[in-house]
Amino acid sequence: METYGEAALLRTAKTALEAQGFCAEDFCDAAIEGLARLDEQGEAQYVRSLHAYLSSGLNLRRAAETMGIHRNTLAYRMRRIEARFALNLGDMNTCFELLFSLWLRDGIGGEVQPESTEPFDSGAVSAALWRFTERTGGAEAPCGGRFKLAVAAVGVGNMGDEKRMELTLALCALPQKPVAAFDEETLFLALPPEEIDAFAEAAGPLCEAARAGLVISQPFAMERLNARLRLCRLALLAAGVQTMEMRDMGSTLFFMALERKISLAPYLCEDVIRVMDEDATRGSALSRALYAYLLNFMDLKKAAQQLGIHRNTLEYQVRKMNAVIGEPPDGSKRFRMMCTYKMLALPDTGVHDV
């Protein structure tokens, strides 16, 4: 992000995403929109509180001072956020994805949509799923309806016909009775949002045994179905044969979508490249240590535990990193450096049309 900066990336991203039928909300954790709705109802400043907490490096005292509230008040809000949206703010990847969602929402996000009360319409979903899987290069038919649904997508492209049918029948026979449609590459299974967790728990072992990738979407409005199904295909490319929640990979999917339209090279943080060059020249492993340090919001103890090394060893490595990049990263640079790691870790799919 050094050459053009964050503002340029956001402007370019908005154009590139719209050209593919995506919007910012497709890549954001749904909890952020839920928090924004609570804020509009006057409950509390949840979005601002979460942003302050994440931007402060998960430091409650510093974040509370920024907010001008008591530390205990902020701690209570964080506990409510965790409970209400099934989040674990002790998981560093979750925290980064939430921070990324806030950044994207602030940069190019749209208006907060009211919560839908329309019931799940299995007939409409089935028809739309089959239209999507049977299209032959033509424009996607629009999907009507504001009711919410969630989708599980299974990668079946490498399976023989018999094995594919066996897995399809097993998944469709689960108690949740999903609405299903498929083509040669992907099996899509749609359910009401309240049933997706139970379905994922039951489907995971079946897909693992079949060595088939499984990705689970977040709840979304029916009108976004076509875009979310294409996003599921992207997620399967990243997941391989793993089972993954798409809320845990929003930043990866965002950069995968961008890479299909633009080169990401001008937006890489040069400091990360310098550290990697240092590793290549001297045979060191500073880049791995830097990633753990950044992911853990520059908490030496947590990062050292993740790496399985002594805290003092990591502290020494951090001093060497700082000598390479010139100065310790602040919160803003930490975010840019983490985004660079995400860009560099994108799967090499060789595909340029979802």
Residue ranges and their predicted role:
Residues 1-354:
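Cytosolic nucleotide-utilizing catalytic cores of signal-transduction proteins
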